[in-house]
């Protein structure tokens, strides 16, 4: 796996699923391929994206700044600086300085990532902030190692939280989660269907599913009534894709 592929993988792992994630993936691909060279416009676009947490925006801004060539005097962006200040916690800053001293002696991506993984996400973000604000300089490979370690820490905690929700025995939470997943699957079907004539059927199925979820929410239903809703939708989606000649091995 190439270095940039690895960076893209880690960064995208902390971006919430949805149309915005696809857009960010495209931007990252363009940046890494050297197709997008306007850092100013890229940062302005990132700043105004909804849904993303300030820290995720900060990490993306850091990656864009590392990758896109820019004039030496280009102004640092406040939204990235604020996100990478470790919540203003002096302990995070102390640890970030210690980590920075270790990273300065490192030259490889994997070496930097290994060192960084023993620090908390707050200290890692602060260390990125030091580098972003030009208070410290490391090689681009080392900076990417720091980025990937930070994303791994965040993705780990997101995964723990997600696992807790998925394994919860509370029927109300499970019911709502199934309806949310069905709704987002329906939305994805509508987007994939596009405007072709064969898409009418998929659009119809998706629309019915969304209306059903809205009705279930409006009138209140038994927690088991949503069981199988998402799977039914996915089966419809896969049947539609087969007819369209699109093969999607793993959607579930």
UniProtKB/Swiss-Prot annotation:
InterPro entries: Flu_matrix_M1, Flu_matrix_M1_C, Flu_matrix_M1_N, Flu_matrix_M1_N_sub1, Flu_matrix_M1_N_sub2, INFV_M1. It comes from the Viruses. GO terms for biological process: viral budding from plasma membrane. It is found in: Virion membrane; Host nucleus. It holds the Pfam family Flu_M1. SUPFAM superfamilies: Influenza virus matrix protein M1. Plays critical roles in virus replication, from virus entry and uncoating to assembly and budding of the virus particle. M1 binding to ribonucleocapsids (RNPs) in nucleus seems to inhibit viral transcription. Interaction of viral NEP with M1-RNP is thought to promote nuclear export of the complex, which is targeted to the virion assembly site at the apical plasma membrane in polarized epithelial cells. Interactions with NA and HA may bring M1, a non-raft-associated protein, into lipid rafts. Forms a continuous shell on the inner side of the lipid bilayer in virion, where it binds the RNP. Determines the virion's shape: spherical or filamentous. Clinical isolates of influenza are characterized by the presence of significant proportion of filamentous virions, whereas after multiple passage on eggs or cell culture, virions have only spherical morphology. Filamentous virions are thought to be important to infect neighboring cells, and spherical virions more suited to spread through aerosol between hosts organisms. This is Matrix protein 1. It comes from Influenza A virus (strain A/USA:Iowa/1943 H1N1). The lineage of its organism: Viruses, Riboviria, Orthornavirae, Negarnaviricota, Polyploviricotina. The gene is M.
